[in-house]
Design a protein with these regions (language model features):
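Glycine-rich cofactor/substrate-binding loops
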Residues: 1-30, 90-91, 272-484
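Leucine-rich amphipathic alpha-helices with coiled-coil/heptad-repeat character
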Residues: 63, 88, 131, 135-138, ...
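Short, well-ordered beta-strand elements within core beta-sheets of diverse protein domains
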Residues: 35-44, 159, 228-236, 360-370
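Alpha-helical structural context
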Residues: 87, 207-208, 368
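Generic, well-ordered alpha-helical scaffold segments in large soluble proteins
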Residues: 34, 38, 55-62, 83, ...
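Charged, flexible cofactor/metal-binding loops and thiol motifs
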Residues: 110-125, 136, 150-304, 309-329, ...
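A helix-coil-helix interface module used to build multimeric assemblies
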Residues: 1-185, 191, 199-203, 264-268, ...
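Conserved hydrophobic residue
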Residues: 44, 49, 256-257, 371, ...
């Protein structure tokens, strides 16, 4: 046996051992499955299998803290082997047959990540549902929409908020589509060219609830792209949430006063009694930055020749921790959205004097006066400048003045049409095309998103049941064998 230098233990094995709490349970499942595969292949006797499974089931009953995961012994697989040797004797060495240590840990990683992908997709569905519920509730709540933090056009808080649901749905669908590749088996890969023992790779895959074996054994052992894609989708999921969090912090400021965060989302200042710091939003923003950094790190590690373990050694813990963080952030934003207090009167008052009707006024001049849009734009710009001299927003009189000043006939503009320009709800009700801000359109969009989230939940449930059933069946079969 090779001696482990203190330097290698501290810098290398300790890094891997730190991931034991994450992978311990999945390693138990992977080892039990491999022991049963060895029995099915006739590689070990029934008696030895019973002894080995007895030790593995004992190991399965223990938390990782009670297993001697010690970097002075080696990495996780070596520590587990030593634990089993001490427990059941030399038969523990049978787990090496037909399988490398990397196959064991990569199987465990896939078992962990496949569940995390499903859980994160479930969390995404809950966020979509929360956004849709609040969007329907506020489909009539007037507010100015902004670009560059400048008032652009009248909208509703419901229409604004709903714009954050579609990106969540897209990322959720990307996560679920990548689950197919994560939920594939590396069992039977052998060292480099296949296993001489585990020949029925399809059976080995199904025993663990994987949908199929990854066909090329070298690709199976060294592929990184499914994990990178999952991490990318988790990062873009939180990036979209960061955008909403950034906006909410601005809208919750005293200067805007559009909304307040619920008490469960804020942290009081220890010095200044009046302050309600939006702590939840800081957590969302900071966590997104962490995930961007972790994604960048994993991409950098993948830039290597093929068949290099460092692409995985530094992913075993980082990837599950990152997916867990993305789930925590998503659940946090869901809570924030549910508890938001919307100040409708303040939002509506922000439209007054903001000139958000200007583009509609220019379009009206196009229709009524036969102007091209550039000329109509200049007329309305002149009206805005004229009104600004008195520090106010434009009115019908300002538009009339600008038309006359520009040499156009204001009588061509119908008075009732001009009055409607200054009714923000009337303008919003006119936006009935697909994706528009009309309340009925917003409600319909939210309904479609809710249906899509429900469909996702149904598909997730089937995948979850398949994985849990396979793992449960493995444990039942192992216990029955031991009890014979």
């Amino acid at each position: 046996m090779f001696d482990v230098s203190p330097e290698l233990a501290e810098s290398g094995y300790a890094w891997e051992i730190a991931d034991a709490p994450i992978l311990h349970n999945a390693l138990n499942i992977a080892d039990i499955a491999h022991a049963l595969d060895l029995l099915d292949a006739g590689a070990i006797s029934r008696a030895d299998t019973q002894t080995l499974l007895g030790g593995l089931l004992h190991l399965e009953s223990l938390p990782s803290s009670e297993v001697n995961y010690d970097p002075s012994i080696g990495e996780m697989v070596t520590c587990r082997e030593q634990f089993l040797v001490d427990l059941v004797g030399p038969v523990a060495g049978s787990l090496r047959a037909g399988r490398t240590r990397r196959e064991a840990v990569r199987t465990a990683l896939r078992l962990v990540v496949r569940q995390q992908v499903l859980a994160l997709t479930q969390d995404s569905c809950a966020l979509i549902e929360a956004i849709c519920a609040r969007s329907i509730e506020h489909s009539h709540s007037l507010m100015p929409d902004y670009t560059y933090l400048q008032p652009a056009q009248a909208s509703t808080f419901g229409h604004y908020l709903l714009s954050f649901a579609d990106p969540v749905l897209r990322d959720a669908n990307r996560l679920l589509s990548e689950h197919v590749h994560v939920n594939s088996s590396v069992s039977g890969s052998g060292g480099a060219n296949g296993s001489v023992i585990i020949r029925d790779r399809m059976r080995a895959a199904h025993n663990l609830g994987f949908n199929k074996p990854i066909e090329h054994v070298r690709d199976a052992m060294w592929q990184t792209d499914p994990f990178l894609h999952v991490l990318f989708s988790a990062t873009t999921l939180t990036l979209g949430q960061d955008r909403l969090a950034e906006d909410l912090e601005i809208f919750a400021s005293r200067e805007f006063g559009f909304l307040s965060l619920g008490n469960s989302s804020v942290r009081p200042s220890v010095l200044m009694p009046q302050k309600r710091n939006p702590y939840a939003l800081s957590v969302i923003r900071g966590s997104t930055g962490i995930l961007i950094g972790r994604l960048t790190g994993q991409l950098a590690l993948s830039k290597a020749p093929s068949a290099r373990s460092d692409t995985y050694i530094y992913a075993y813990g980082e990837l599950p921790r990152s997916l867990a963080l993305a789930g925590q952030v998503t659940r946090l934003l869901t809570s924030v959205v549910r508890d938001l207090v919307v100040h409708e009167a303040r939002m509506k008052s922000a439209i007054e004097g903001s000139n958000t009707e200007a583009a509609d006024a220019a379009h009206l001049l196009m229709r009524s006066c036969g102007l091209d849009y550039l000329t109509a734009h200049r007329v309305i710009r002149a009206a805005i400048t004229h009104a600004a001299e008195d520090d106010r927003g434009i009115s019908a009189d300002d538009i009339t003045w600008a038309l006359i000043d520009g040499g156009f006939d204001p009588e061509q503009v119908e008075a009732d049409e001009l009055d409607e320009i200054f009714d923000p709800m009337a303008l919003i009700q006119s936006r009935k095309s697909i994706g528009g801000a009309a309340p009925d359109t917003v409600t319909a969009m939210a309904g479609s998103l809710l249906a899509a989230a429900l469909d996702l939940r149904t598909r997730l449930g089937a995948e979850q049941n398949n994985s849990e059933s396979a793992e449960s069946h493995l444990l039942i079969r192992a216990r029955e064998l031991v009890q014979e």
